[in-house]
């Protein structure tokens, strides 16, 4: 299985699919799956290409979810080999997307192929949901596919997202949930004027100081057994004309919260508004909710992937919910159990992104055993 996974991963990496471009990756996948009897459905939205492929017509529906798009390479001169050449050096496959996530995407596809070849009349349905818009806006990708499926009452029972979840060793971590993410774009109004005549102006930076202190030190919650505490970070701040003798008319502050299930986005909005009113600030605020928190509690999917990892590499993974958001947040809206498992994430988005060839082979075996555990038990 390892050779098949690595070969497909190389084919995908060699296509420079900077988000939201697919560059033919999904066509390669569709042609392979179609030969095995998968039903292929294309769901393009704007400049994003999405693929929904399935084999079988009954429940449970087991979906593999992934993305073909990658982030930009940065300075290619800093790479030890060209970022889209997919070279193998000392047992490591190098290239943009090797770990995030063309390697695990290849492993999921080969695992599905091998299972269907051996079990052409399997029970349930095996599906793949693949998008070219995960790394950028994520507005035309998985969410649109999910909305389309829900509109026609299609279900996903279990979903494996191939994001690189492993931390120090393959299989040491799986993600059984993710925190929510909400961004506030806050504009605090003042009155522009000359710095020598502050009584004729109103400095929004000065007026916002105590508010910012409260905002950044407020304890939203203490987390719970599944999630770490909610955290807030200021990401961007700007005011002024660039001149040293002008009091600015407006202060812009952008902040993001990664929040757990102890609070809701509405509670966050209400509390921030209360803080702003308390400090008598003139403001307007625009909110962007990227995703609500989701959690897959111990059950059949988590048991199946845990058992597959234990059987393949002899370690028991830890289920965690930390880190950023993923497309799992959209699939969870369908009521599916969602778990993320993939290779090490230590080089993702970096120069010289790479993944162990041995680990890719193991990923394929683990995904295959997960299918066996879910469909043959």
Curated annotation (Swiss-Prot):
Keywords: Amino-acid biosynthesis, Cobalt, Diaminopimelate biosynthesis, Hydrolase, Lysine biosynthesis, Metal-binding, Zinc. It is an enzyme of class 3 (hydrolase). PANTHER family: ACETYLORNITHINE DEACETYLASE, N-ACETYL-L-CITRULLINE DEACETYLASE. It catalyses: N-succinyl-(2S,6S)-2,6-diaminopimelate + H2O = (2S,6S)-2,6-diaminopimelate + succinate. GO terms for molecular function: cobalt ion binding; succinyl-diaminopimelate desuccinylase activity; zinc ion binding. Pathway: Amino-acid biosynthesis; L-lysine biosynthesis via DAP pathway; LL-2,6-diaminopimelate from (S)-tetrahydrodipicolinate (succinylase route): step 3/3. Zn(2+) 2 binds at residues 100, 135, 349. One of its GO terms (cellular component) is cytosol. Competitively inhibited by L,L-DAP, D,L-DAP, 2-carboxyethylphosphonic acid (CEPA) and 5-mercaptopentanoic acid (MSPA). Succinate is a poor inhibitor. This is Succinyl-diaminopimelate desuccinylase. Binds 2 Zn(2+) ion per subunit. NCBIfam families: dapE_proteo, PRK13009.1. Zn(2+) 1 binds at residues 67, 100, 163. Its EC number is 3.5.1.18. Catalyzes the hydrolysis of N-succinyl-L,L-diaminopimelic acid (SDAP), forming succinate and LL-2,6-diaminopimelate (DAP), an intermediate involved in the bacterial biosynthesis of lysine and meso-diaminopimelic acid, an essential component of bacterial cell walls. It can only hydrolyze L,L-N-succinyl-diaminopimelic acid (L,L-SDAP) and is inactive toward D,L-, L,D-, and D,D-SDAP. The gene is dapE. It comes from the Bacteria. Pfam families: M20_dimer, Peptidase_M20. Homodimer. Changing residue 349 to A: Absence of desuccinylase activity and of zinc ion. Changing residue 134 to A: Absence of desuccinylase activity. Its cofactor is Zn(2+).
């Amino acid at each position: 299985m390892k050779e098949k996974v690595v070969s497909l991963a190389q084919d995908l990496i060699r296509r420079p699919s900077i988000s939201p471009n697919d560059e033919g990756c999904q066509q390669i996948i569709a042609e392979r799956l179609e030969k095995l009897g998968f039903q292929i459905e294309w769901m393009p939205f704007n400049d994003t290409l999405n693929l929904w492929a399935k084999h079988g017509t009954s429940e449970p529906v087991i979906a593999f979810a992934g993305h073909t798009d990658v982030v930009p390479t940065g300075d290619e001169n800093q790479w030890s080999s060209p970022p889209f050449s997919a070279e193998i050096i000392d047992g490591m496959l190098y290239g943009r997307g090797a770990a995030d996530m063309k390697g695990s995407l290849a492993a999921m596809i080969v695992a599905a192929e091998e299972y269907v070849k051996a079990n052409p009349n399997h029970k349930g349905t095996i599906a793949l949901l693949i998008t070219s818009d995960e790394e950028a806006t994520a507005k035309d990708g998985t969410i649109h596919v999910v909305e389309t499926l829900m509109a026609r009452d299609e279900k996903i029972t279990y979903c494996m997202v191939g994001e690189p979840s492993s931390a120090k060793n393959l299989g040491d971590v799986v993600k059984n949930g993710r925190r929510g993410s909400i961004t506030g774009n806050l504009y605090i109004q003042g009155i522009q004027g000359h710095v020598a005549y502050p009584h004729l102006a109103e400095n929004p930076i000065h007026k916002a100081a105590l508010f910012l202190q409260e905002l950044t030190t407020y304890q939203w919650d203490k987390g719970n057994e599944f999630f770490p505490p909610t955290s807030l970070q200021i990401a961007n701040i700007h005011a002024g004309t660039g001149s040293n003798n002008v009091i600015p008319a407006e202060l812009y502050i952008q902040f993001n919260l990664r929040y757990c299930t102890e609070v809701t986005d509405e509670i966050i909005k209400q509390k921030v508004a209360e803080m702003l009113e308390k400090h008598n600030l003139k403001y307007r605020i625009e909110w962007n909710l990227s995703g609500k928190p989701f959690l897959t509690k111990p059950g059949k999917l988590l048991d199946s992937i845990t058992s597959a990892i234990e059987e393949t590499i002899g370690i028991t993974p830890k289920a965690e919910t930390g880190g950023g958001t993923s497309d799992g947040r959209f699939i969870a809206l369908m009521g599916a159990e969602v778990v993320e498992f993939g290779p090490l994430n230590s080089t993702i988005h970096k120069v010289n992104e790479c993944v162990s060839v041995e680990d890719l082979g193991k990923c394929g075996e683990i995904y295959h055993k997960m299918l066996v555990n879910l469909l043959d038990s």
